[in-house]
Regions:
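Positively charged n-region of N-terminal signal peptides that target proteins for export
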Residues: 1-4
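Hydrophobic membrane-insertion alpha-helices, especially the h-region
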Residues: 7-19
């Protein structure tokens, strides 16, 4: 018995020595193999998940909440007090313990949106290193690089009555056109329908709030009437001289417990410069695709047409 205890003590001491002397990258790699605590859905998020999707009622994959209006709550006000209300900022939370993209808050200004407009900056492609939760059948979370790795993709091209193309997109939480990054922390696995709805000109799915906000800034400065050369000859400050709009933007991918793919995204937007007169939005965007049953636990799916 004493020999067993001595052996256990030696193993423990060696393990402790290795842990204390390991570098951060090794620790992250080791921690990725440890069992994670379970995550439970909050009551408020469950209410959103429980909203039934009906393509006839929600042809563009979103439903308005509270008549489409929001109010700044205590956490919103605290964040604005802390981060400021004049200069643009973005708050990313990184990946959670399960490797999933989390909510993003931002103060959107004309300067931020102008800099990433297509007339000024061409949107880059996603790096091959950007992998998202649910993307792979054999997915593994790389805690060192904060991304997902895998060989067998869950994504495939489908031919459905309302869609011909790949089922999934790497879906921005904060759109590139609104100042978002192309990194894993700003991306979830979203259906094409979640991204653009029915491809309506006014924007569907996540495109609806994104288009509404983007057009507000573009219209204020006449960006749509500028040539690329004209836009690129101006600094953001010069281009946005006549714009006073400041939009508080809060986007929250919502998951059911430990699932890797969000059931949908809660989007809130509020123009703080005029108490929500210009922009006031509150909606739930369904992460669904008609004729497809998605296994949100791992991103696999079956076609049911």
């Amino acid at each position: 018995m004493k020999k067993i205890l001595s052996f256990i003590s030696i193993v423990f001491m060696v393990g402790l020595f290795l842990y204390v002397n390991a570098d951060d990258e090794l620790l992250k790699e080791l921690e990725s193999y440890l069992p994670q605590e379970s995550v439970e859905t909050t009551e408020g998020d469950q209410e959103l998940i429980d909203i039934e999707y009906d393509i006839n009622k929600h042809p563009d994959n979103y439903v308005l909440l509270n008549d489409g209006k929001m109010k700044l709550d205590k956490s919103d006000k605290h964040r604005l007090d802390k981060r400021g209300t004049e200069t643009a900022w973005v708050n990313y939370k990184g990946l959670d313990q399960l490797g999933r993209g989390q909510d993003v808050q931002a103060l959107l200004t004309c300067e931020l949106v102008f800099k990433q407009s297509s007339k000024v900056t061409e949107r880059p492609d996603f790096s091959s290193s950007v992998g998202v939760a649910g993307q792979y059948k054999d997915g593994r979370l790389d805690r060192v690089k904060e991304t997902w790795r895998g060989e067998e993709s869950n994504n495939t091209e489908l031919h459905l009555p309302n869609h011909n193309g790949y089922l999934y997109n790497k879906s921005h939480t904060l759109a590139w056109s609104l100042g978002g990054s192309m990194e894993t922390e700003n991306v979830t696995l979203g259906t094409r329908r979640q991204n653009v709805g029915s491809n309506d000109a006014d924007g569907g799915g996540m495109g609806y709030p994104e288009t509404t906000i983007r057009n507000q800034f573009y219209n204020e400065i006449g960006l749509n009437d500028m040539t690329k050369a004209e836009a690129q000859s101006m600094t953001p400050e010069q281009a946005c001289e006549k714009s006073n709009t400041k939009v508080y933007y809060d986007v929250d991918p919502v998951y059911q417990d430990d699932e890797l793919v969000p059931r949908g995204t809660h989007v809130r937007a509020y123009s703080i410069n005029d108490d929500g007169e210009t922009i006031n939005m509150n909606l739930w965007v369904f992460n669904t695709q008609p004729y497809v049953d998605i296994n949100y636990a791992d991103g696999t799916f079956t076609v049911n047409q």
